[in-house]
Amino acid sequence: QVDPAYFFHDLNAKVNWRLGDRDRLYLSTFQGLDDFGVKTRSEYGSSIDEIDVGLDWRNSVLALRWNHEHSANLFSNVTLMKSRYDFNTGFDFSLTDETPDGDITERFASLYNSGIRDIGGRIDFDYTPNNRHFVRFGGNVTRHQFYPGATQVILDYGDDFNLDTTLGAPDLFSTEAFIYVEDEIDLNERWKANVGGHFSTLFVEGVTYT
Protein backbone atom coordinates (compact mmCIF):
# COMPACT_ATOMS: atom_id res chain seq x y z
CA GLN A 1 0.00 0.00 0.00
CA VAL A 2 1.41 3.39 -1.05
CA ASP A 3 -0.03 6.70 0.20
CA PRO A 4 1.53 9.82 -1.34
CA ALA A 5 0.80 13.21 0.20
CA TYR A 6 1.67 16.63 -1.12
CA PHE A 7 0.75 20.21 -0.33
CA PHE A 8 1.91 23.42 -2.05
CA HIS A 9 0.86 26.76 -0.63
CA ASP A 10 1.78 30.38 -1.42
CA LEU A 11 0.12 33.49 -0.05
CA ASN A 12 0.83 37.13 -0.86
CA ALA A 13 -1.05 39.89 0.92
CA LYS A 14 -0.69 43.65 1.29
CA VAL A 15 -2.75 46.29 3.04
CA ASN A 16 -2.14 50.01 3.43
CA TRP A 17 -3.47 52.84 5.54
CA ARG A 18 -3.47 56.55 4.90
CA LEU A 19 -2.65 58.15 8.25
CA GLY A 20 -2.75 61.71 6.96
CA ASP A 21 -1.73 63.90 4.05
CA ARG A 22 1.97 63.11 4.65
CA ASP A 23 1.95 59.60 6.12
CA ARG A 24 1.12 56.14 4.81
CA LEU A 25 1.57 52.72 6.36
CA TYR A 26 2.03 49.48 4.40
CA LEU A 27 1.87 45.94 5.76
CA SER A 28 2.85 43.08 3.46
CA THR A 29 3.48 39.37 3.89
CA PHE A 30 4.49 36.31 1.94
CA GLN A 31 3.82 32.81 3.27
CA GLY A 32 5.03 29.74 1.41
CA LEU A 33 4.80 26.12 2.50
CA ASP A 34 5.58 23.04 0.42
CA ASP A 35 5.19 19.55 1.84
CA PHE A 36 5.72 16.20 0.13
CA GLY A 37 5.76 12.70 1.57
CA VAL A 38 5.15 9.03 0.84
CA LYS A 39 3.99 6.32 3.23
CA THR A 40 4.15 2.62 2.40
CA ARG A 41 2.85 -0.40 4.27
CA SER A 42 3.67 -4.01 3.39
CA GLU A 43 2.58 -7.25 5.03
CA TYR A 44 4.57 -10.48 4.82
CA GLY A 45 2.84 -13.19 6.81
CA SER A 46 3.06 -12.11 10.43
CA SER A 47 5.39 -9.18 9.68
CA ILE A 48 4.42 -5.63 8.79
CA ASP A 49 6.88 -3.00 7.61
CA GLU A 50 6.04 0.69 7.32
CA ILE A 51 8.11 3.40 5.66
CA ASP A 52 7.46 7.14 5.95
CA VAL A 53 9.59 9.48 3.82
CA GLY A 54 9.00 13.20 3.56
CA LEU A 55 10.39 16.66 3.12
CA ASP A 56 9.02 20.16 3.57
CA TRP A 57 10.23 23.72 3.37
CA ARG A 58 8.74 27.00 4.52
CA ASN A 59 9.31 30.66 3.63
CA SER A 60 7.74 33.45 5.64
CA VAL A 61 8.26 37.21 5.29
CA LEU A 62 6.50 40.04 7.14
CA ALA A 63 7.26 43.72 6.52
CA LEU A 64 5.86 46.98 7.88
CA ARG A 65 6.77 50.19 6.01
CA TRP A 66 6.07 53.78 7.00
CA ASN A 67 6.24 56.38 4.24
CA HIS A 68 6.54 60.02 5.33
CA GLU A 69 6.65 63.20 3.26
CA HIS A 70 8.91 65.65 5.08
CA SER A 71 8.55 68.31 2.39
CA ALA A 72 7.87 68.57 -1.31
CA ASN A 73 11.49 67.55 -1.96
CA LEU A 74 12.20 65.00 0.79
CA PHE A 75 10.58 61.62 1.41
CA SER A 76 11.51 58.77 3.74
CA ASN A 77 10.62 55.10 4.14
CA VAL A 78 11.16 53.23 7.40
CA THR A 79 10.82 49.45 7.12
CA LEU A 80 10.73 46.77 9.81
CA MET A 81 10.95 43.17 8.62
CA LYS A 82 11.00 39.63 9.89
CA SER A 83 11.63 36.47 7.87
CA ARG A 84 11.90 32.75 8.44
CA TYR A 85 13.11 29.80 6.37
CA ASP A 86 12.87 26.13 7.38
CA PHE A 87 13.86 22.92 5.65
CA ASN A 88 13.04 19.48 7.04
CA THR A 89 13.44 15.98 5.69
CA GLY A 90 13.09 12.56 7.27
CA PHE A 91 13.02 8.82 6.87
CA ASP A 92 11.19 6.52 9.30
CA PHE A 93 11.18 2.72 8.99
CA SER A 94 9.48 0.28 11.35
CA LEU A 95 9.11 -3.50 11.30
CA THR A 96 6.50 -5.21 13.44
CA ASP A 97 6.41 -8.96 14.07
CA GLU A 98 3.26 -10.52 15.49
CA THR A 99 4.11 -13.22 18.05
CA PRO A 100 2.06 -15.23 20.55
CA ASP A 101 3.56 -13.07 23.30
CA GLY A 102 2.58 -9.80 21.57
CA ASP A 103 3.85 -7.50 18.86
CA ILE A 104 7.58 -6.75 18.63
CA THR A 105 8.47 -3.53 16.82
CA GLU A 106 11.88 -2.39 15.63
CA ARG A 107 12.36 1.15 14.36
CA PHE A 108 14.99 3.22 12.60
CA ALA A 109 14.50 6.93 11.85
CA SER A 110 16.68 9.76 10.61
CA LEU A 111 15.37 13.35 10.71
CA TYR A 112 17.17 16.46 9.46
CA ASN A 113 16.22 20.12 9.86
CA SER A 114 17.83 23.50 9.23
CA GLY A 115 16.67 27.10 9.08
CA ILE A 116 17.33 30.82 9.08
CA ARG A 117 15.67 33.60 11.10
CA ASP A 118 16.12 37.28 10.18
CA ILE A 119 14.87 40.44 11.84
CA GLY A 120 15.86 43.94 10.84
CA GLY A 121 15.13 47.55 10.09
CA ARG A 122 15.87 49.91 7.23
CA ILE A 123 15.53 53.62 6.48
CA ASP A 124 15.71 55.23 3.03
CA PHE A 125 15.54 58.89 2.03
CA ASP A 126 14.74 60.34 -1.40
CA TYR A 127 15.75 63.97 -1.86
CA THR A 128 14.99 65.88 -5.06
CA PRO A 129 16.41 69.44 -5.07
CA ASN A 130 15.07 69.92 -8.60
CA ASN A 131 13.88 67.87 -11.54
CA ARG A 132 17.48 67.30 -12.74
CA HIS A 133 18.97 66.21 -9.43
CA PHE A 134 18.04 63.12 -7.37
CA VAL A 135 19.73 61.98 -4.13
CA ARG A 136 19.16 58.71 -2.25
CA PHE A 137 20.67 57.73 1.11
CA GLY A 138 19.92 55.45 4.02
CA GLY A 139 20.95 52.43 6.04
CA ASN A 140 20.00 48.94 7.14
CA VAL A 141 20.59 46.62 10.11
CA THR A 142 19.69 42.91 10.03
CA ARG A 143 20.12 40.28 12.73
CA HIS A 144 20.63 36.75 11.37
CA GLN A 145 20.20 33.48 13.22
CA PHE A 146 21.39 30.41 11.31
CA TYR A 147 20.46 26.84 12.14
CA PRO A 148 23.20 25.07 10.13
CA GLY A 149 21.50 21.70 10.36
CA ALA A 150 20.75 19.03 12.92
CA THR A 151 20.26 15.32 12.37
CA GLN A 152 18.26 13.23 14.81
CA VAL A 153 18.88 9.48 14.72
CA ILE A 154 16.47 7.08 16.42
CA LEU A 155 17.16 3.36 16.83
CA ASP A 156 14.66 1.26 18.76
CA TYR A 157 15.18 -2.49 19.00
CA GLY A 158 12.97 -3.10 21.99
CA ASP A 159 14.75 -4.16 25.16
CA ASP A 160 17.95 -5.04 23.27
CA PHE A 161 19.08 -1.60 22.15
CA ASN A 162 17.77 2.00 22.08
CA LEU A 163 19.34 5.18 20.75
CA ASP A 164 17.94 8.69 20.37
CA THR A 165 20.57 11.31 19.63
CA THR A 166 20.94 14.61 17.78
CA LEU A 167 24.03 15.59 15.81
CA GLY A 168 24.75 19.00 14.32
CA ALA A 169 26.54 22.32 14.50
CA PRO A 170 25.43 24.94 17.06
CA ASP A 171 23.31 27.92 16.03
CA LEU A 172 25.19 30.83 14.51
CA PHE A 173 24.31 34.50 15.09
CA SER A 174 25.44 37.48 13.03
CA THR A 175 24.56 41.13 12.51
CA GLU A 176 24.80 42.84 9.13
CA ALA A 177 24.69 46.62 8.62
CA PHE A 178 25.26 49.06 5.80
CA ILE A 179 24.85 52.72 4.87
CA TYR A 180 24.76 54.20 1.39
CA VAL A 181 24.42 57.40 -0.59
CA GLU A 182 23.73 57.91 -4.30
CA ASP A 183 23.68 61.15 -6.26
CA GLU A 184 22.20 61.26 -9.76
CA ILE A 185 22.32 64.52 -11.66
CA ASP A 186 21.71 65.65 -15.24
CA LEU A 187 24.68 67.85 -16.15
CA ASN A 188 23.21 68.84 -19.49
CA GLU A 189 21.14 67.34 -22.28
CA ARG A 190 23.94 64.92 -23.22
CA TRP A 191 25.69 64.16 -19.95
CA LYS A 192 24.46 62.56 -16.76
CA ALA A 193 26.44 61.67 -13.61
CA ASN A 194 25.71 58.97 -11.07
CA VAL A 195 28.05 58.75 -8.09
CA GLY A 196 27.72 57.25 -4.65
CA GLY A 197 29.17 55.18 -1.88
CA HIS A 198 28.31 52.07 0.09
CA PHE A 199 29.82 50.89 3.37
CA SER A 200 28.88 47.56 4.91
CA THR A 201 30.01 45.54 7.90
CA LEU A 202 29.28 42.10 9.30
CA PHE A 203 29.62 40.96 12.92
CA VAL A 204 29.91 37.18 13.40
CA GLU A 205 30.58 35.62 16.80
CA GLY A 206 32.75 38.52 17.99
CA VAL A 207 34.58 39.00 14.67
CA THR A 208 34.02 42.07 12.47
CA TYR A 209 34.22 41.99 8.68
CA THR A 210 34.18 45.16 6.56
Report each predicted region and the residues it spans.
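Outer-membrane beta-barrel translocator/channel fold
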Residues: V2, D35-V38
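Non-catalytic, glycine-rich low-complexity segments
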Residues: D52-G54
